[in-house]
Regions:
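C-terminal and inter-domain tail/linker signature
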Residues: 1-249
Length: 249
């Protein structure tokens, strides 16, 4: 099973067949959700099957995968979920594998749906992994207040989707720089650092990484995730989702 199949099967597990957990997860697979601790105690496929069966008895939600970043033993993807009342939300999952099965999972759900169309599969070509990793470092510097980097880090038609609200979106380097400057002017803006290792997909020119945002006043932190696409050596699209709790691992 490749990672494209894994993301589709993971959605099917939640949509229709909880027993698929046994094909997807290691016996000690752990999960983390950005909005609550409900998955913290769900370890391995047996507990996952029971949990999902109970979840499906209470919720009629349909998950659909959208954009994949595939690094072999790690992958992340953008997805949508349609609720019973017709509301659609966008989310991102990050997965680390062990022996071909998911060992660690992180799940983020936005407050709204990203309505922009997804990049065309296979249209991007190939970018050197070191270039993508360097862009990630510059992106973090940008998010930490270096607004002047926007013109060098993103394309002229860059588009940022914020999972929280439309006020956090940005289109093009000028809007992005203005957004960063406004955020830097707030009281005690958080400092963002990459958590674990970026998921670099040079073939698709996609990258995703977990990050931690920590405030200086009380040291409180929350986990977040960014998924980005690369074109002509710069970021062209970005989806950024922020949780309300710190990472457990």
């Amino acid at each position: 099973m490749d990672n494209e199949k894994r993301m589709t099967t993971w959605c099917r597990m939640w949509n229709e067949d909880p027993s698929l957990a046994h094909d997807l997860m290691t016996d000690d697979c752990t999960q983390w959700s950005d909005h609550g601790a409900g998955l913290d105690t769900v370890v391995g496929p047996h507990e996952q099957e029971r949990f999902v069966a109970g979840y499906r008895a209470r919720h009629v939600n349909i998950f659909s995968p959208r954009v994949l970043a595939d690094a072999g033993d790690r992958f992340a993807y953008l997805w949508d979920v349609r609720k019973a009342d017709g509301q659609v939300l966008t989310g991102i999952d990050v997965n680390h594998l062990k022996d071909g099965r998911v060992r660690e999972n992180w799940t983020f759900v936005a407050e709204r749906r990203c309505e922009r169309s997804d990049p065309e599969p296979g249209a991007a070509g190939h970018t050197d992994p070191a270039t993508i990793e360097d862009l990630c470092r510059q992106w973090v510097q940008l998010r930490n207040g270096r607004a002047e980097l926007a013109k060098d880090v993103v394309t002229g038609d860059f588009d940022l989707f914020s999972g929280a609200e439309a006020a956090g979106d940005a289109h093009g380097p000028s809007e992005l720089a203005d957004l960063i400057e406004r955020q830097a002017e707030t009281n005690d803006p958080p400092v963002i650092t990459i958590h674990r290792q970026p998921i670099v997909d040079p073939g698709r020119r996609h990258v995703a990484f977990l990050w931690t945002a920590e405030t200086g006043a009380d040291g409180a932190s929350v986990g977040g995730v960014d998924l980005l696409t690369v074109r002509s050596g710069r970021f062209a699209r970005a989806w950024s989702l922020t949780g309300i709790r710190p990472f457990r691992y």
